């Protein structure tokens, strides 16, 4: 859902789901440096689902390894709940097998969680309704 702030300014809502407060904080700072993007945060996959139900974001940045509900399990559930929501999976390693599993869960992009430029490029691609799969 795009938030209309005035006649000329649109905000894109990005939800970050990661169990690491340091990573969420860093991603938030990186995302909010981009004009017109605002962030929400979730602690794990289950929390992401709850936040998506409360306030529909325009895109989800989802960590793979989280307690309570991991990224792939969350992606499956989120695709049933909000099938049009673009999901960008962030993980330290991107072997071809993981990329294939992510695609099978309805994820539209995979990036290294430690490459800020790659994350921004992935978000931009998904917002243009393109896929963005990086591999190691």
Name these PLM-found stretches.
Residues 1-13, 120-136:
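Non-catalytic signal-transmission and effector/linker regions of two-component phosphorelay proteins
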Residues 17-18, 42, 60:
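Conserved sequence signature across two-component system core domains
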Residues 21-40:
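Two-component/phosphorelay signaling modules centered on CheY-like receiver
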Residues 44-47, 70-73:
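Acidic catalytic/metal-coordinating carboxylates
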Residues 55-61:
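Active-site beta3 strand of CheY-like receiver
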Residues 66:
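Receiver (REC) domain active-site loop signature in two-component systems and cognate sites
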Residues 73, 94-111, 117-121:
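Alpha4 helix (beta4-alpha4-beta5 surface) of REC/receiver domains from two-component response regulators
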């Amino acid at each position: 859902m795009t938030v209309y702030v005035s006649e000329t300014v649109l905000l894109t809502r990005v939800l970050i789901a990661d169990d690491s407060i340091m990573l969420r904080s860093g991603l938030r700072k990186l995302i909010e440096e981009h004009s017109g993007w605002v962030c929400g945060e979730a602690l794990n996959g289950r929390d992401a689902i709850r936040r998506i139900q409360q306030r529909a974001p325009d895109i989800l940045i989802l960590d793979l390894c989280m307690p309570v509900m991991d990224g792939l399990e969350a992606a499956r559930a989120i695709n049933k709940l909000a099938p049009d929501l673009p999901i960008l999976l962030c993980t330290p390693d991107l072997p071809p097998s993981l990329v294939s599993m992510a695609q099978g869960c309805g994820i539209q992009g995979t990036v290294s969680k430690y490459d800020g430029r790659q994350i921004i490029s992935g978000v931009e691609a998904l917002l243009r309704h393109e896929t963005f799969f990086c591999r190691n």
